[in-house]
Amino acid sequence: MTRKIAIYGKGGIGKSTTTQNTAAALAFFHEKNVFIHGCDPKADSTRLILGGLPQQTVMDTLRIEGAERVTVDKVVKTGFKDIRCVESGGPEPGVGCAGRGVITAIDLMEENEAYSEDLDFLFFDVLGDVVCGGFAMPIRDGKAEEVYIVASGEMMAIYAANNICKGLAKYARQSGVRLGGIICNSRNVDGEKEFLEEFTKAIGTKMIHFVPRDNIVQKAEFNKQTVTEFQPEANQAQEYRELGRKIIENEDFVIPKPLAMDELEAMVVKYGLMD
């Protein structure tokens, strides 16, 4: 049975990097069949898996050829360890709604049976901290069953995580989606781990893994690879291996209890993140 997971988090927090490195570790170390569906108009959710190759998006194919000619072969590409990849794409800049593109792309993938039954994991890598409209579709309509939020010990990352939890709590009862935990993509700020542990406990979940900051991630990206492909014996590859293991074994799924703004600000002040 395929586990369907949406990855959310503040813009620039490293969602796509975390998603791709986790997917690579699941495929390489744990021998899982993985599919990544990029839900960002930038269409950069799968480039490390595909060795930096540009991918024609679902929306581009729709514009060029029409819905009736969109096929799995045209828009789904296979990369490292047979990880399958598709990018929703979006409208031309300044025209239309990118969220609508996410809805259209997911619907088309389902109609074309792209999410095959042999998959162990299907990841939706979702734009920024937007939890309304089309970008909420994976959690609103039950396309994803689990959510992991990528955060750090920085103030705005925590604010974004709390806002995502508000959206998740709103849709959870109607769609059945649940929060599986917070992934800390470390920025090496003071008290980061302690802050994340207190925040996750307060909202009723856990920090599923603390991913330390390591320059090998950037080195691998320069080589258009995930860390696991670039240097599988590296410490950072083992961190993603461990994150993958924790996701595989995770059975702790909750409806989060987001903090009120005064509670959140008090926590931020406690850890010295606000002047």
UniProtKB/Swiss-Prot annotation:
Pfam families per record: Fer4_NifH
Molecular function terms from GO: 4 iron, 4 sulfur cluster binding; ATP binding; metal ion binding; nitrogenase activity
Binding site for [4Fe-4S] cluster: C97, C132
EC number(s) per entry: 1.18.6.1
Keywords linked to the UniProt accession: 4Fe-4S, ADP-ribosylation, ATP-binding, Iron, Iron-sulfur, Metal-binding, Nitrogen fixation, Nucleotide-binding, Oxidoreductase
GO biological process, alphabetically ordered: nitrogen fixation
ADP-ribosylarginine PTM sites in chain numbering: R100
Post-translational modification (record): The reversible ADP-ribosylation of Arg-100 inactivates the nitrogenase reductase and regulates nitrogenase activity.
Catalytic activity, reaction form: N2 + 8 reduced [2Fe-2S]-[ferredoxin] + 16 ATP + 16 H2O = H2 + 8 oxidized [2Fe-2S]-[ferredoxin] + 2 NH4(+) + 16 ADP + 16 phosphate + 6 H(+)
The record's free-text note on cofactor binding: Binds 1 [4Fe-4S] cluster per dimer.
PROSITE patterns in the cross-refs: NIFH_FRXC_1, NIFH_FRXC_2, NIFH_FRXC_3
Cofactor entry: [4Fe-4S] cluster
Function, in words: The key enzymatic reactions in nitrogen fixation are catalyzed by the nitrogenase complex, which has 2 components: the iron protein (component 2) and a component 1 which is either a molybdenum-iron protein, a vanadium-iron, or an iron-iron protein.
Entry's family note: Belongs to the NifH/BchL/ChlL family.
Subunit (UniProt): Homodimer.
Misc. remarks from the entry: This subunit is associated with the iron-iron nitrogenase component 2 (the third type of nitrogenase).
Protein name: Nitrogenase iron protein 2
Protein species of origin: Rhodobacter capsulatus
Lineage, highest ranks first: Bacteria, Pseudomonadati, Pseudomonadota, Alphaproteobacteria, Rhodobacterales
Encoding gene (name): anfH
